[in-house]
Curated annotation (Swiss-Prot):
Annotated source species: Schizosaccharomyces pombe (strain 972 / ATCC 24843)
Record-given protein name: Exocyst complex component sec15
Keyword Chaperone: no
GO biological process, alphabetically ordered: exocytosis; Golgi to plasma membrane transport; intracellular protein transport; vesicle tethering involved in exocytosis
Coiled coil (UniProt feature): 69-115
Length: 768
C-alpha cells in the first residue's frame, strides 16, 4: 500500500472539522482512484472508524456524561458516518465508473498517441514523397528544356538524398527506375543532338573548307605578288617562305565568320553528360566511330571523270572536316588524341589519292588537270596551316604532273597531225624575211641569202618545232605559282619533251611510211636531220632550266648538250625511213623481175639486154638521181647497196627456181649479158660506184661458172678465191645440176667429157 495515500487518509482523519473532512474527501477519492487503491482506502477509513468507536466507548465508560454527550455526538457521527458511507458508496460507485471511463480514456489516449506517431510518420513520408515528386517534376521541366546537366544533378540528389527516405515503399523502385530511365533518355537525347549537330556541320563542311581556302589563297596570292619577279626567281623560291608567310598573315576563324558559324555546344554538353555519368571512355569510342563513318561519306559515291564541281566540293569538305577535327583537338583536351586525328587524315588522303589517280590519267583536258592541281595545292596549304602532314598530297600533285604531261601530249599531237596532213613533203620555199623570221629564225641559224630561199626541209619542220615550243611553255603552265612543285616540273619537263617527240612526232611519222611515196620518204629523212638541232636546243633549255623564250641564240651559243635518247630516236627514225625506202624500191624490183621471161633451153644466143631490165634500170636511175637527191652521201650509199644487193639476190633466186630443169649455154650467155648490163649501171651510179658494182659479183661468178671451159678450176683453191669466192657451194650445185642437162650422157658424144667434169664437180661439192 502506498504510504502517501495512507498518510493522506490519516491527515483527513486528524481533521476535526467535519466540513473540512468532507472537503478533503473528494481529493482522497481522486487520489485513491488515480492510484487504484480504492479498497485499501475504504478499509483504512473503516479501521479509523472502528478506532474512533472504541475510543468513544472508552471515553463513555470514563465519563458517562461525556459518554452521553459523546453518544449523541457519536450518533451524530454515526449519522454523518452513514451519510459519509453512503456518500462514499456513491463516490465509490462514481469512482469505479470514473475509473472505468478513465481506463477507456487512457486506452483511447494510448491509441491516439499511436495514431499520432503513425500520422507523423506518414506525414513525413508524404512530405518526402512530395519533395521527390516535386524534384521529379522539376527534372522533367529541365529535361523538356534540354537542360541535361541540371537534370542529372537533380536525379543524383533524388538518388543520394531523398530516395533513402522512401526505402520500403513501392514508390522507391518506381523512382529508382525513373532515374535510370531519365539517365538513359538524357544519354539518348544528347547523342541524338550530337548526331544532328554532326549532320548539320557535315552540310557546312564545304563552306568551312571553301571560306578557309579562300583566305589561304588570298594570302598565297599576296605572297606571290610580293615575291614573284619572273619564272626563274619563282622556281628558286623555297616553299618554306610561303609556309611562314601563311602562318604569319593568316588571321581568320574558319568556324566563326560571316559565311559560316559552328558552335561546339552540343559536343560540350554530350561530353559533360557522359563525363558526369562516368561513360566518357565509351563516348570517346563512339565519337571516334562516328567521325570515321562521316569521313567515309566525304568522298563522292562514284567518280569516273574529273568533274571539278564534284571534286571541288569534295576537297572543300575534306578541308572543313579536318579543320573541325583540329578545333576539337585543340578546344577539348584529352578527348581526341593526335594519333586518332592523324589516322583519319591518313585514311582520307589515301582515298583521295586512289580516287583522283584512277581518273586523272584518263582526263584529256589539261585545263581541268591544272584546276585540279590548284585545288589540291590549296588544300595542302590549308592543311599545313593547321599542322597536318601533306606529303601524300604533294606526291599526288607530282603524279598529276604525269597526267598533265600525258594530256598535253595528246592535245598537241593534233597539231602534228595537221602539219603532217598539210605538208607537201617537198623543200620549203621561204619568200620573205618576215616568213623567215617567223618560221626559220627561232629554230635554225643559216647564213644570209637572198629571197626566195629553198630550205632542205619541208614546212612540216618549223610547224612541228613551233608545236614543241608551245608544248614546253604549256607544260610549265602546270607550275603556275605552285613553287612547291618547281623542282619536279623542271625534272619532268625534259622527260615529257622527249616522250612527246619520240611517241607523237617520230612514231606517228613512222606510221605514215606505208602511205608515202619514195620522194616523200626521202624528204622525210631530210626532215629528220633538220629536226635535230632545234629539238636539241629546246631540250638544252630545259636541262639548263632556262626560260623557253631564251631558246634561240643563247641556247645555240652554249656548250652542246645532247640527249642520247633523243638522238637515238631520231637516228632510228631515219634508219627506219631509209629501210622503208629500199623496201619500196625492192618491191618495185620484184615487180620488174616478175616480168622476166628467160628461155633457159634456147640454143640461140641473145644479143640484146632483157627488156624488163632496161625498164627497171630506168626506174632505178630516176629513183637514185631524183627521189634520193639531197640525202647525205652515206644514206644514199646505204640505199644503193641495199637495193642492188636485193636485185642480185633476187636474180640468183630467179636462176635457182626449181621449175628450171635445164640451162643451155646460149641461155647462160644471155644471162651473162644482163649481168654485165647491171654492172655497167651500178658503176655509173654516183657515190661509191665501185662498191655498187661489186653487188653483182655473185651473179657474174654464176655466169662464169656456167660458161667455164674447165670445171675443175672451181676446185682449185687459188682459182676459187680469185674467181668464185662469192659463190656458195649449195648455189653452185643447183646451177650445175641444171646446166649438166645441157650435155649428153652418151659415152660416144662429144659432150661426154664436159658432162663428166660437171658430174665430178657436183659430187665433190656435195661431199664438202
Amino acid at each position: 500500500m502506498d504510504i502517501d495515500v495512507l498518510e493522506f487518509v490519516d491527515k483527513i482523519a486528524s481533521i476535526e472539522s467535519a466540513g473540512d473532512t468532507l472537503d478533503r474527501l473528494p481529493q482522497l477519492i481522486s487520489l485513491a482512484c488515480e492510484k487504484g487503491q480504492e479498497t485499501q482506502v475504504y478499509e483504512r477509513l473503516n479501521e479509523l472508524a472502528s478506532k474512533s468507536a472504541i475510543r468513544v466507548e472508552q471515553l463513555s465508560a470514563e465519563n458517562n456524561q461525556d459518554f452521553s454527550k459523546s453518544v449523541n455526538q457519536l450518533s451524530v457521527v454515526r449519522s454523518e458516518l452513514r451519510s459519509l458511507q453512503s456518500l462514499m458508496a456513491d463516490l465509490n460507485t462514481d469512482i469505479q465508473a470514473s475509473g472505468r471511463d478513465l481506463q477507456n480514456m487512457k486506452q483511447q489516449l494510448n491509441s491516439l498517441s499511436t495514431s499520432e506517431r503513425f500520422l507523423t510518420k506518414y506525414h513525413n513520408l508524404v512530405r518526402s514523397c512530395m519533395q521527390v515528386l516535386h524534384q521529379v517534376q522539376y527534372s522533367q521541366e529541365l529535361l523538356s528544356k534540354k537542360q541535361y546537366l541540371p537534370t542529372l544533378r537533380i536525379c543524383s540528389e533524388i538518388s543520394e538524398v531523398h530516395l533513402k527516405r522512401l526505402d520500403g515503399l513501392g514508390m522507391y523502385s518506381t523512382i529508382q527506375q525513373y532515374i535510370v530511365t531519365t539517365k538513359e533518355a538524357i544519354c539518348s537525347a544528347v547523342m541524338e543532338d550530337l548526331h544532328e549537330w554532326l549532320f548539320s556541320i557535315r552540310q557546312k563542311l564545304p563552306l568551312v573548307g571553301k571560306s578557309c581556302s579562300q583566305q589561304i589563297d588570298e594570302a598565297r596570292r599576296r605572297w606571290a605578288r610580293e615575291y614573284k619577279e619572273d619564272l626563274v626567281n619563282l622556281s628558286s623560291k623555297t616553299s618554306i617562305s610561303l609556309e611562314l608567310y601563311l602562318l604569319e598573315m593568316m588571321d581568320f576563324s574558319p568556324l566563326d565568320n560571316e559565311i559560316v558559324k559552328i558552335s561546339f555546344e552540343p559536343l560540350y554538353i554530350c561530353l559533360q553528360v557522359h563525363s558526369y555519368l562516368g561513360l566518357l571512355s565509351s563516348f570517346r569510342s563512339s565519337f571516334e566511330r562516328d567521325r570515321r563513318r562521316q569521313q567515309e561519306f566525304l568522298a563522292p559515291k562514284s567518280l569516273t571523270t574529273l568533274d571539278m564541281a564534284v571534286v571541288s566540293e569534295w576537297l572543300n569538305s575534306i578541308a572543313g572536316f579536318m579543320i573541325v577535327e583540329y578545333y576539337i583537338l585543340q578546344c577539348i583536351p584529352n578527348f581526341r588524341s593526335y594519333e586518332e586525328v592523324q589516322n583519319i587524315w591518313t585514311i582520307i588522303c589515301e582515298k583521295l589519292v586512289e580516287t583522283i589517280l584512277s581518273v586523272a590519267f584518263t582526263e584529256q583536258s589539261t585545263t581541268t588537270i591544272i584546276k585540279l592541281k590548284n585545288q589540291i595545292v590549296l588544300l595542302m596549304h590549308t592543311m599545313e596551316r593547321f599542322g597536318f602532314s601533306v606529303e601524300s598530297l604533294r606526291n599526288l600533285c607530282v603524279e598529276l604532273i604525269d597526267a598533265f604531261g600525258g594530256a598535253l601530249i595528246l592535245k598537241h599531237s593534233v597539231f602534228f597531225e595537221e602539219a603532217f596532213e598539210k605538208d607537201v613533203y617537198a623543200p620549203m620555199i621561204v619568200e620573205t624575211q618576215e616568213e623567215y623570221d617567223h618560221y626559220i629564225a627561232p629554230y635554225w641559224n643559216f647564213p644570209s641569202e637572198p629571197f626566195p630561199r629553198t630550205m632542205s626541209f619541208s614546212k612540216m619542220c618549223p610547224l612541228c618545232c613551233t608545236t614543241l615550243s608551245k608544248f614546253v611553255r604549256h607544260f610549265f603552265m602546270f607550275l603556275n605559282d605552285s613553287v612547291i612543285l618547281a623542282t619536279e616540273v623542271n625534272e619532268k619537263a625534259p622527260r615529257f619533251y622527249r616522250r612527246f617527240i619520240l611517241r607523237s612526232l617520230v612514231d606517228r611519222l613512222k606510221s605514215l611510211y606505208p602511205k608515202l611515196a619514195l620522194s616523200q620518204m626521202s624528204q622525210l629523212v631530210k626532215n629528220f636531220y633538220a629536226f635535230e638541232d632545234p629539238l636539241l636546243q629546246i631540250e638544252k633549255s630545259l636541262v639548263l632550266n632556262k626560260p623557253i623564250h631564251q631558246i634561240g641564240a643563247e641556247a645555240s651559243s652554249s656548250n652542246n648538250v645532247k640527249s642520247t635518247e633523243l638522238l637515238e630516236g631520231l637516228a632510228n627514225a631515219r634508219k627506219s625511213a631509209l629501210h622503208e625506202i629500199f623496201v619500196k624500191i625492192n618491191l618495185k624490183i620484184d615487180d620488174f623481175l616478175g616480168l622476166a621471161e628467160y628461155d633457159w633451153t634456147t640454143t640461140q644466143v641473145r644479143k640484146d639486154v632483157s627488156g624488163y631490165l632496161q625498164e627497171m634500170v630506168t626506174y632505178l636511175q630516176t629513183m637514185y638521181l631524183e627521189s634520193l637527191a639531197g640525202l647525205p652521201k652515206h644514206d644514199k650509199s646505204y640505199v644503193y647497196l641495199e637495193t642492188l644487193d636485193h636485185l642480185c639476190t633476187a636474180m640468183v633466186d630467179l636462176l635457182s627456181d626449181p621449175s628450171i630443169r635445164k640451162v643451155t649455154t646460149a641461155a647462160a650467155e644471155g644471162f651473162k649479158l644482163d649481168v654485165e648490163y647491171l654492172e655497167s649501171f651500178a658503176a655509173q651510179v654516183p657515190d661509191q660506184s665501185i662498191v655498187n658494182a661489186d653487188s653483182f659479183i655473185e651473179l657474174r661468178q654464176c655466169a662464169n661458172l656456167l660458161l667455164g671451159d674447165n670445171m675443175e678450176e672451181y676446185l682449185d683453191t687459188d682459182k676459187f678465191m680469185r674467181d668464185f669466192n662469192r659463190l656458195q657451194p649449195a648455189v653452185a650445185i643447183k646451177f650445175l645440176e641444171r646446166h649438166i642437162n645441157n650435155y649428153s650422157a652418151n659415152p660416144l658424144s662429144n659432150d661426154r667429157p664436159k658432162r663428166r667434169a660437171i658430174e665430178i664437180l657436183i659430187a665433190t661439192l656435195k661431199k664438202r
